[in-house]
Regions:
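The serine-hydrolase catalytic nucleophile loop
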Residues: 82-96, 248
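Alpha/beta hydrolase fold serine-hydrolase catalytic domain that processes acyl esters and thioesters
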Residues: 156-301
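A glycine/proline-hinged amphipathic helix-loop "lid/cap" segment
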Residues: 1-65, 300-301
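Short beta-strand element of the alpha/beta-hydrolase
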Residues: 72-81
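Gly/Ala-rich beta-loop-alpha elbow adjacent to hydrolase catalytic centers
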Residues: 147, 151, 155
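Short beta-strand-to-loop junctions in surface cap/lid or active-site-entrance loops
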Residues: 63-72, 225-230
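Catalytic nucleophile-loop/oxyanion-hole region of alpha/beta-hydrolase
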Residues: 87-88, 94, 102, 107-142, ...
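Structural signature of beta-strand start/N-cap positions in the alpha/beta core
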Residues: 74, 103-105, 142-144, 171-172, ...
C-alpha cells in the first residue's frame, strides 16, 4: 500500500458523515446526503435541458442533457449513492465538466432508487435511457456509458443487457470505482474497511437494499464480475487505491482483457472511493476527464 494523498486525508477529516450510512434508514440516508452536499462552484456554464422519458407503466424517467445535441459523441451517466440515494443534481458539476472537457453530450439519468425499487428496476431505467440516448441524441450511433460506484455497476450491467439482446447501442463503457460483485472478502475490502469515505459496512447495507433476496447477488446482471464478458464494448476502468471496491474493479478489467475485450485499467494512487465525481479533487477529476476524452476519441468519434 502507498500513502493516502494529503488532500484526500484533509477531505476525509471534513467528510465524516453525521451518522454512519449503514445505521440509517433509506429516508434518513437521503436526508443526510442532501444536508452534507457541498456547492460545486466553478463548473462550466453550458446548455442543459431536463427531459422526461415514458416508462412502459406510464411513469416517467428523468434525464438531464448537457451540451448541444448534434454530431458530438454521447455518454450516458449514472450517479453513485449505493442505489439508495442520489439525483440529477448530485453530479451536476462533474457532468458539466465532462461535457465541456471531453467534447461530448452527457445524458445523466435519474434512475429509481432502492429499496422502494430494487434490482432489476434501476437497471431497467438504465437500459431505457441508453435506448433513448442512442436513438434521439446520437442518431443511431453507439453511445458510451459511464457511472460512479453503484452507477458504474449500472453502466456495466447495461452493456451486458445490450450484448445479450443484440441491440448494439453501446460502444464504450467507463466504470469509475464501480461496484462489480456481491462479495466482501478481498484485500481491498480488508485494507480499506473503515475510515476511508466508503466502508465495508456501508457496502453491505447498500447491497441489502438493492437486492430483494441475497440470492440475487449471484445474478450476473447484479454481480457483473460473474457475467460472461465476451463481446462487451471496449472499456476504460478507473479505480482508486484506498477504496474497498478497488480489487473487484481491477478484477473486472482483467477479466475483460481475458475475454478479448479492448480494455484499459487506470488506478489512481492515493485516492479514495468516488474521487472522480467529487469536486474536492479537481486535479484528479481533470485527469479522469482527459482519460475519458481519449477513450471517446478512440471508440466513439
Amino acid at each position: 500500500m502507498g500513502e493516502l494523498a494529503p488532500h484526500a486525508a484533509a477531505f476525509l477529516k471534513v467528510a465524516v458523515p453525521a451518522s454512519p450510512w449503514w445505521s440509517l434508514t433509506p429516508a434518513e440516508a437521503r436526508a443526510q446526503h442532501l444536508a452534507s452536499r457541498r456547492p460545486d462552484t466553478g463548473a462550466p456554464d453550458i446548455a442543459t435541458s431536463d427531459v422526461d422519458l415514458p416508462r412502459p407503466d406510464g411513469s416517467v424517467l428523468g434525464v438531464r442533457i448537457y451540451g448541444v445535441v448534434g454530431d458530438s459523441p454521447v455518454l450516458v451517466f449514472f450517479h453513485g449513492g449505493g442505489w439508495v440515494y442520489g439525483d440529477l443534481d448530485m453530479a451536476d458539476g462533474f457532468c458539466r465538466r465532462l461535457s465541456d472537457g471531453a467534447g461530448v453530450v452527457v445524458c445523466s439519468v435519474d434512475y429509481r432508487l432502492s429499496p422502494e425499487h430494487q434490482f432489476p428496476l434501476p437497471l431497467e431505467d438504465a437500459c431505457l435511457a441508453v435506448a433513448w440516448a442512442h436513438a434521439e441524441l446520437a442518431g443511431g450511433r453507439p453511445v458510451g456509458v459511464i457511472g460512479s460506484s453503484a452507477g458504474g455497476n449500472l453502466a456495466i450491467a447495461s452493456c451486458i443487457v445490450d450484448r445479450d439482446e443484440g441491440t448494439g447501442r453501446i460502444g464504450l463503457q467507463i466504470p469509475l470505482c464501480a461496484v462489480t460483485d456481491h462479495g466482501f472478502d478481498n484485500t481491498s475490502y480488508r485494507d480499506n474497511a473503515d475510515g476511508l469515505f466508503l466502508t465495508a459496512d456501508d457496502m453491505r447495507w447498500y447491497w441489502g437494499h438493492y437486492l430483494a433476496d441475497p440470492a440475487h447477488g449471484s445474478n450476473p446482471r447484479a454481480s457483473v464480475l460473474r457475467a460472461d464478458l465476451a463481446g462487451l464494448p471496449p472499456a476504460l476502468v478507473i479505480t482508486a487505491e484506498f477504496d474497498p471496491l478497488r480489487d473487484e474493479g481491477e478484477s473486472y478489467a482483467r477479466l475483460l482483457m481475458r475475454a478479448g475485450v479492448a480494455s484499459s485499467l487506470v488506478r489512481y494512487d492515493g485516492m479514495i472511493h468516488a474521487f472522480a465525481a467529487l469536486s474536492a479533487f479537481p486535479v484528479e477529476q481533470a485527469r479522469v476527464i482527459a482519460d475519458v476524452a481519449a477513450a471517446v476519441d478512440t471508440y466513439l468519434r
